[in-house]
From Swiss-Prot:
Phosphothreonine PTM sites in chain numbering: T330, T500, T505
Alphabetical list of PANTHER family matching this protein: CHITIN ELICITOR RECEPTOR KINASE 1-RELATED, LYSM DOMAIN RECEPTOR-LIKE KINASE 3
Gene: LYK3
Family stated for the protein in its record: Belongs to the protein kinase superfamily. Ser/Thr protein kinase family.
Function: Putative Lysin motif (LysM) receptor kinase that may recognize microbe-derived N-acetylglucosamine (NAG)-containing ligands.
Signal peptide from the UniProt entry: 1-19
Any Pfam family: LysM
Protein name as catalogued: LysM domain receptor-like kinase 3
Chain sites annotated for binding ATP: L347, G348, H349, G350, N351, Y352, G353, S354, V355, K368
Natural source organism: Arabidopsis thaliana
Length: 651
């Protein structure tokens, strides 16, 4: 019976079984590599981003060939001495097995988990992708799965590489010895493909077919021939059609002029303290790729939609948004979407308001409700979120306002706050997170912070990083939220600095920020170090301990407690003191060396001297390497469903 099942299982595997990793010797090696991926019709641009865990700028394309080229960091695994890069894959259907579903999705670029588990919709699978690092003769190596008809000569011509190079890298002795499904490494001197224009994500719809053909579901050969034979009538049709187009353009110009005139008169003459805005009432706010169409260039009014004029505080008027403008909703829409702000829709309370679940224009959203006295924080969050867009940052959709209240509308992040999944999760109806999931969440949050610190046109500090401001989506991927305290960082000759009054949450505040009010990216890194300690220990940022000689309990920062513990844990082989502070909900299902590395990284992040703290780029690299090691550890526990599910069952 077992043999029959095994043979049946093998028969289901795709034809990409010949993909093999590239061997390596230097386990400290880290390089940039590319993966050539040809998506199927169900894999949109946003799906590809998620599958490979990359940003849009990390993807180039060869549109004519139908290929995307994904840039990934590649490293040498310490156990197998093979080059790989990691990602996660969310299974969509309860069909087949994890192995063949994963291999098929990545078209042979993946080295999936060695498991015979059945695929389960919603399950998150850790996947190793096959990559390579150049020996120094070329700038990059690109992983490419051979297709039917490929040859060394055709690949040489397509990618502008000599045949000798391809043969040398892949050890090809026979030019005809290339089989469809083989994994090849293409040496490159420059980035392949061209930058992918986001406007190509949703191509325009094709012209409609004639009604008679649509009724039958196709266009017959007779219809095609009839069209071809009617060439003598084309000039007359062109003339009539041209006149129709000109007339339509004239009508459109008149409508545009009317719209522009009405917008120039939109300022309130009756109230000198306010501005009048046109409010969209019926338009949707989701684009075809599934992302939120939140902040858009130009005016946010729609000529074919019902409009309403409302008064909005002058601080939110002209000049608040430099380029992009968020969508604006009516108070009535917000009130109806949240079921009149019912307690059953309440998601939680933040520093500056309450957050409610809402169903707005048939889409799930989160709505932050603030008093009008919080205009400064409201404006700060709107301005930042209209400039930063990243898969690990919560997306802004729009806002609404009345004389007394302000409302910010965000994407709804289904699993809620990380805090609820770390601190006594069972009492909140949550299942404890596994080690792999905690590692991935830490990396996601680090990437979001790295983005606002390093990769935006103007750099920002968040100033309120904590586990309640890190949200988890349905796949348990992390997104940073609540930018009400975010601050622009100015570059000076002595580095970056932003002088401000001290704001934030006790337990996460860096020493220099508390004493001098100097907010820098290193302030965020200190707070992130505290988050890492919470992820390891499952404890809150401030712990109540029994004070000696007094009746009142003492409140101590988690960072100071963990630093004291680490003094008695010099390495991963002698970490008995540290193990006492590891979250018992993980039930000892974690690699001790990886946990010790994250604890050490957290220790570096909370160093009293901000100069000695790593930057977020270094933190991301460290967490990526730790996750790779954790995945190797996970592979040794292939039969343990508690590890692979991402959640720890039981207890």
């Amino acid at each position: 019976m077992n043999l029959t099942f095994y043979i049946f299982f093998l028969s289901l595997l795709p034809s990409f079984s010949s993909s093999k990793p590239m061997n390596c010797s230097d386990t400290t090696r880290l390089c940039s590599s590319f993966l050539a991926f040809k998506p199927n019709q169900n894999q949109s641009f946003s799906v590809i981003q998620s599958m490979f865990d990359v940003l849009p700028q990390d993807i180039t394309a060869d549109i004519s060939g139908g290929y995307f080229f994904i840039k990934k960091n590649c490293s040498c695994l310490t156990t197998t001495h093979q080059y790989t890069t990691n990602t996660t894959f969310t299974i969509r259907q309860n069909v087949g097995y994890v192995y063949n579903v994963t291999v098929s999705a990545y078209s042979g670029l993946a080295f999936p988990p060695n498991t015979t588990r059945a695929a389960r919709a919603g399950a998150v699978v850790s996947v190793q992708l096959l990559c390579g690092c150049s020996s120094g003769l070329w700038n990059y190596l690109m992983s490419y799965v051979a297709m039917a008809g490929d040859s060394v000569q055709s690949l040489s011509s397509r990618f502008g590489v000599s045949m000798d190079r391809i043969e040398d890298v892949n050890g090809i002795l026979n030019l005809d010895n290339i089989t469809a499904g083989d994994l090849l490494y293409i040496p490159l001197d420059s980035v392949p493909g061209e930058p992918y224009e986001t406007s190509k994500i949703n191509p325009p719809a094709p012209s409609p077919a004639p009604a008679s053909s649509l009724a039958n579901g196709n266009i017959s050969d007779d219809q095609v021939n009839h069209t071809a034979k009617s060439g003598s009538h084309v000039p007359y049709i062109w003339i009539v059609g041209g006149l129709g187009v000109v007339l339509a353009l004239l009508v459109l110009c008149i409508l545009v002029c009317i719209c522009l005139r009405s917008s120039s008169c939109s300022s309130s003459e009756e109230d000198g303290n306010g501005h009048n805005f046109q409010i969209l009432r019926k338009s949707g706010f989701f684009c075809g790729s599934g992302r939120y169409n939140c902040c858009r260039s130009g005016d946010f009014r729609q000529t074919n939609g019902e409009t309403q004029v409302v008064a909005i505080p002058k601080a939110l008027g002209d000049g608040m948004f430099e380029i992009e403008k968020p969508m604006v909703f009516t108070y009535e829409e917000i009130r109806a979407a949240t079921d009149e702000f019912s307690d059953s829709n309440l998601l939680g309370h933040g520093n500056y308001g309450s957050v409610y679940f809402g169903l707005l224009r048939e889409q799930e959203v989160a709505v932050k409700r603030m008093t009008a006295t919080k205009t400064k924080e409201f404006a700060a969050e709107m301005k930042v979120l209209c400039k930063v867009h990243h898969s690990n940052l919560v997306e802004l959709i729009g806002y609404a306002a009345t004389v007394d209240e302000l409302f910010v509308v965000y994407e709804y992040v289904r699993k809620g706050m990380l805090k609820s999944h770390l601190h006594d999760p069972q009492s909140k109806g949550n299942t404890p997170l596994s080690w792999i999931m905690r590692n991935q969440i830490a990396l996601d949050a680090a990437r979001g912070l790295e983005y606002i610190h390093e990769h935006t046109k103007t750099h920002y500090v968040h100033r309120d990083i904590k586990t309640s401001n890190i949200l988890l989506d349905e796949a348990f991927r992390a997104k940073i939220s609540d930018f009400g305290l975010a601050k622009l960082v100015e570059k000076t000759g002595e580095g970056e600095i932003s002088v401000t009054k001290v704001v934030g949450t006790y337990g996460y505040l860096a020493p220099e920020y508390l004493s001098d009010g100097l907010a820098t990216s290193k302030s965020d890194i200190y707070a992130f170090g505290v988050v890492l300690f919470e992820i390891i220990s499952g404890r809150e940022a401030v712990i109540r301990t029994e004070a000696i000689g007094t009746k009142n309990p003492e409140r101590r920062p988690l960072a100071s407690i963990m630093l004291a513990v680490l003094k008695n844990s010099p390495d991963s082989m002698n970490m008995s003191s540290l193990k006492e502070f590891v979250d018992p909900n993980m039930m000892d299902l974690y690699p001790h060396d990886c946990l010790f590395k994250i604890a050490t990284l957290a220790k570096q992040c909370v160093d009293d001297d901000p100069i000695l703290r790593p930057n977020m780029k270094q933190v991301v690299i460290s967490l990526s390497q730790i996750l790779l090691s954790s995945i190797e550890w996970e592979a040794t526990l292939a039969g343990n469903s508690q590890v692979f599910s991402g959640l720890v069952q039981g207890r």
